[in-house]
């Protein structure tokens, strides 16, 4: 399938949406038989809604005024914003139709689909962030944690582009509360502008202030927090075969390494077997380095927030700074690299891992290095 069909949005003067061409994608065809709740989507199924959203978007003066790169990001986010609904939609006991979790699931599905099509990293990650947060402008202004949520959004996408996605989403449907939601989106725009994070990341007094702010409650993002860290954990992150070992040799050859691959070998555990014992052994070795206040590398896939979370919490408990080094390669390069590994991971396992893949962000660590192979 052609990536250009997705990344080159409709152009003037006609701004024609290529509906027939888009239907060549299996995930587009899957939208049509997916029902929606008539209260929020009286227009019908997900494909009808998606078509209405895209037609609304390309007619919006604010979208037409964007740079070509920003147009492509918003266009693609609108096309993919409900891509996970076919997998998350169900009928509740009371007869209502829900799609709980479709935003987060859509982020991960879009990331995998675009990676397989060799989409540029920056475009793909902007689109993924917009999809994950596409409903937040509907209600952010009503949340007690609006300040923190706005700051979080600004570190993974852009609030100004997100507002356009949300506006196209709500105007591209038939519902009773459209005007209330449109008003909330305008309030979202104003709030993010007041917070200084409408078209740029939220600024913090220091990296440590940022990390502690997102890990705790009741703090101001503007009040500096004393940096009392005494060591550093360097957390590698990336799919098998992406080149994490190479990155360690190039950047951290003089540091001790806790490697889950080596622990699998020691414990004689295959990659497609239960990894509980390997993960626990790795955690204990990490704890030993933290107790000694050392700088060290933790080398594992660490592919989503759930996997990274316990180690990041452990590092925080021991007063360690965290640098995440995320390594990525094109799909063809990655699979070739995996085949060349001594400890080859079955490709079916890599596929399953890519379905739960969340690229790290500065919400999680003091520093983030992106290494693209």
Go through each PLM region and give its residues.
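N-terminal pre-Walker A segment at the start of P-loop NTPase domains
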Residues: 193-228
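Conserved phosphate-donor/acceptor-positioning beta-strand/loop module used by diverse small-molecule
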Residues: 318-337
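Conserved substrate/cofactor phosphate-moiety recognition/catalytic segment
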Residues: 245-296, 331-335
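Conserved GTP-binding G-domain of TRAFAC-class P-loop NTPases and closely related GTPase folds
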Residues: 234, 254, 331-373
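Divalent metal-dependent catalytic cores for phosphoryl transfer on phosphate-bearing substrates
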Residues: 58-184
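Acidic/His-rich, divalent-metal-binding segments that scaffold phosphate/diphosphate chemistry
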Residues: 1-92
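Glycine-rich phosphate-binding P-loop
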Residues: 232-252
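Pre-Walker A (Motif I) flank of P-loop NTPase domains
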Residues: 224, 228-234, 292-294
